[in-house]
């Protein structure tokens, strides 16, 4: 008997559904591939979430204040007050407000968000340095890796990443704005620039000028420009006005901060800008820009260098106007310098190679010479970068100690009865080491103004070690002469500090 192979052809409708499903899946993947920012964000968000699971994760002083303000915005039972803490920053609170709905997870969610921005800055640095570099793919890859490494080795970068500050996110926004502009995505570039302007005021002139250029270049985006421009003053000045009655409170707080600029603020702020990125990166960036201009008249290189210089000018001018001139204010400029530096290492190597190739017998060795010069430049930079490498390695145990310290502070809060134990009345008061004031306000579910860094009234005083995590213990008003230890949890001591006879509404 002859056997027959029997096959079953699926109905036409099933074939169409399968085809449509495959087509939809393919189109989604193509959409991701065509949107490097979206794809990078997904990957960096996953990395940030993973880092929160395996690395110490706790906010530092300023981020705790943003988390407190976010909770106040979404919680009708808490008053919204921007006094008693650091300067207001709009962009972080746009994230921490929705995070505040999930109180327990808000601090971790914010740190994940900040780290996502930091990882994105490294991707953007890689992309930009690769775009600045011509030649073989390995040359573009080397330029990108060196640029990203330069950012990682900027001063305090690892601290910012561990502790959830906004600076890595700021660098990411600035570099991705440049990347999107170069790829012709001008609307996205403008939105990213607005995001940077909602973190640092130095970005305001840049987004203003870019918006004017875009207004003439692409009339379809004028509505976006108007909304973006309007959002900057509304979000910077509106919430402080509502929360304190002072729309310019952020500026007041910033000017009140002691920047320790010494007798020569101008020279000191310049030194800080130069010291932010590692010295080899600054040097090779300068040499690379010079080669790009005098050899090729490359406007892109010079434009990026001019943007970095312009940011420097703004930081210096604001410092001379009374602002503290901290190193981190320069970070977007440092990001551009690292991009130029990474590309410059390859550019310098190519320049040397082309010079040697003009000689007999060297033309066939151009690639080898380029690789050798890159290797020499990298090796020469290592001794000048070891201190930053050591600083970066030290941040993990420091962050782990901070996690443990704040866990002990939370236990001390529970030991004295939590919010009700510390604040039996609306006028009750508490104080703590200045470095954890905002963290204690979060744990006690109060506004920042109800937790002091000095015992100026009768109340409850939390005293921890004097170190880089907690800062100095609270100063005590001389009138508060009676002190009673009411709890001790590990390194934390909790006192009831009062003026004799004034015990009403004192917790503990």
Which residues are covered by each model-predicted region?
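Membrane-interface transmembrane helices that cradle and orient dolichyl/undecaprenyl
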Residues: 8, 137-138, 175-189
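Hydrophobic/aromatic-rich transmembrane helices and adjacent perimembrane loops
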Residues: 161, 167, 199, 205, ...
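Perimembrane helix-loop-helix junctions
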Residues: 3, 20, 27, 183-186, ...
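Membrane-embedded, lumen/periplasm-facing catalytic core of multi-pass transferases
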Residues: 367-437, 443, 447, 452
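Signature aromatic-anchored transmembrane alpha helix within multi-pass, membrane-resident enzymes
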Residues: 42, 141-142, 226-234, 284-285, ...
